[in-house]
UniProtKB/Swiss-Prot annotation:
Keywords: Acetylation, Endoplasmic reticulum, Lipid biosynthesis, Lipid metabolism, Membrane, Methyltransferase, Phospholipid biosynthesis, Phospholipid metabolism, S-adenosyl-L-methionine, Transferase, Transmembrane, Transmembrane helix. Residues 2-55, 108-187, 234-258, 311-362, 411-439, 485-534 are lumenal. This is Phosphatidylethanolamine N-methyltransferase. The lineage of its organism: Eukaryota, Fungi, Dikarya, Ascomycota, Saccharomycotina. Present with 1810 molecules/cell in log phase SD medium. It catalyses: a 1,2-diacyl-sn-glycero-3-phosphoethanolamine + S-adenosyl-L-methionine = a 1,2-diacyl-sn-glycero-3-phospho-N-methylethanolamine + S-adenosyl-L-homocysteine + H(+). Belongs to the class VI-like SAM-binding methyltransferase superfamily. CHO2 family. It comes from Saccharomyces cerevisiae (strain ATCC 204508 / S288c). Gene3D superfamilies: 1.20.120.1630, 2.60.40.2840. The gene is CHO2.
Amino acid sequence: MSSCKTTLSEMVGSVTKDRGTINVEARTRSSNVTFKPPVTHDMVRSLFDPTLKKSLLEKCIALAIISNFFICYWVFQRFGLQFTKYFFLVQYLFWRIAYNLGIGLVLHYQSHYETLTNCAKTHAIFSKIPQNKDANSNFSTNSNSFSEKFWNFIRKFCQYEIRSKMPKEYDLFAYPEEINVWLIFRQFVDLILMQDFVTYIIYVYLSIPYSWVQIFNWRSLLGVILILFNIWVKLDAHRVVKDYAWYWGDFFFLEESELIFDGVFNISPHPMYSIGYLGYYGLSLICNDYKVLLVSVFGHYSQFLFLKYVENPHIERTYGDGTDSDSQMNSRIDDLISKENYDYSRPLINMGLSFNNFNKLRFTDYFTIGTVAALMLGTIMNARFINLNYLFITVFVTKLVSWLFISTILYKQSQSKWFTRLFLENGYTQVYSYEQWQFIYNYYLVLTYTLMIIHTGLQIWSNFSNINNSQLIFGLILVALQTWCDKETRLAISDFGWFYGDFFLSNYISTRKLTSQGIYRYLNHPEAVLGVVGVWGTVLMTNFAVTNIILAVLWTLTNFILVKFIETPHVNKIYGKTKRVSGVGKTLLGLKPLRQVSDIVNRIENIIIKSLVDESKNSNGGAELLPKNYQDNKEWNILIQEAMDSVATRLSPYCELKIENEQVETNFVLPTPVTLNWKMPIELYNGDDWIGLYKVIDTRADREKTRVGSGGHWSATSKDSYMNHGLRHKESVTEIKATEKYVQGKVTFDTSLLYFENGIYEFRYHSGNSHKVLLISTPFEISLPVLNTTTPELFEKDLTEFLTKVNVLKDGKFRPLGNKFFGMDSLKQLIKNSIGVELSSEYMRRVNGDAHVISHRAWDIKQTLDSLA
């Protein structure tokens, strides 16, 4: 993921046009003629500021706007309220269509073919034409044909309009046709936009309830807030983009100016068309009339159609799609996964009411869609018999349990690559594990949201008489907003980001950089902010049902916890703790009061950190008072042990149980045998004496009697004893001899008697055929070897040599019958101890214990996990 190149491609005029003076350079689109655009004014000043010159069209537009109010009064007095409302509703629909369809078509043809500009050039509308026919033009002022008279009139009218509008120093013929055409185009835009606005406002005014009780409530307060916010958006948008982008200037000519994101354009994509219409919904709240709300939704939706089919294509064609190589990193990762893994196919994704990437040969896709179909059909067929309380509990428990399951996978995957390891150790690939995760995550989303839809639908159906139509529509708008957020999020981060690919395939990431394109330009975590608004929309749709409020709180909390405590720490670990300020954050911090609060918090934080550092320095000074050899415990322990041995020798000079070379080696690496020297007074020795090997943690502090079994890890002290226990205990006795005062011998514990577990052990000498302890050796350590993992060949070589010495390898295959102490678990531990990965017992049985396959598989897993680090 990466930051996006700053261009105009995000929106019309989504940048500051530094036009403080007339020194801004501009050029025509096709002929590349450069010029300096004249100073222009906004729509309101042009029409209503008495200090500015007014053209004939501007005066007509102002009169038309004012006349709407007189017409409203007359129609109201003559035909009544309802007729007047519908009269202005029809007018609004006309002007809205003229805006989105009429202006849209004009701009479409101007963008593709420069129709208006070419028309002006063809008919010499803005050129100096002599009274006789110009040899280089098809235009003639002396012709009596209707067409030529018409264009002659248009020529004179347009030139008169511009001269009456612009200052005296404006030279009409010194500028290219593009700028003059744009100035005339602005007049018609003023007419359509102002009429669109005024007729809508009059319609809304006529729909406001007459009762003060219906007006003064929380809806009106929220509506006023939205209206004020809308006004700020429009004013700030014009401050940023100026007239050039406000009137679609780049459809006619291009300005050469620095592009800077600022103000409201940091908050939302296409703010003039998105949050710039919140006033519509504020007025709808004040009216509390669902008809007004539907009209507002129609107006807003048609504006988005204008954006999609007119502005965005022009922007992409003129400025590019606004993406660079870094911004497409996630998309390239998806392509790379498909390229390197031929059996990989894009995952099924649920977006709103549709499914993307359905694969007819993938069973899980049928299972997911079948689950939705079964739940929906079951609900429709049994709607009358479904208990809403039981359904609520089902939705709540399903959401909570499935979220815990998903969160656990992500947390353990982030900490130790647990999910990937689980599949690798069972013989599957890294990408296969990712595919299974994709199914799990998508199924989790589909299941929980399907249950939420069913619960909300039944809640509305059972209580429909109390449902407010406006609340129902507002709820659907919030659902649509969440659906849009999900689509924009996926568009920005692709499938790889949508499915938390950096948790599972971080080795595919080539650039450690978070994306700042699309919706992530405005919000750092859009899924945490807008990803639950649809769930809160169900609260509105159900008239604030308690069960839906509880579910909305659950959705919000689980979403917040997942982002805050699992996703954010992992992102910091993968991409670094770079502080990324969202567009909304930049705008808020740009406000002076909030900036002052932020500065105060930063100063307090610095004071606290400084005091903690000073206190830490003072506390560290006390450590210098300790002796220098305080931490050197090793020599002290050796001295204590020698003293204890000295005391034991004086008490019984012929009692001895020592490990050979114990002064040199206290850690025995398998398969190295451990040889034990023992000595007992002849009067205490019994032919049935035996020596057992135990974990120190098992025997604990009981020094007189062993209360745990040896598990077969024992040896006789004499070859003539324990004849019915096989040869193993005889072969371990390598030496025994007796004198007049004592008996001494030597016992060797090899791989047939030793433990194959890392740990601290001790030998215990037992009297006769009992568990009474006579002697205990010094504790020592046994550890598994660390095999050479430089190459898979060296790893295989060391592994086969070790298994051969342990007597569990036959024909290149692992056969645990050769040593009962070295089983499948021991082999797994050996591999894990050497290479850091674990293979499952099921996988090793599946490959028949083949040492070659096992060693190479373990080495491949190691390489995969290393690439994820």
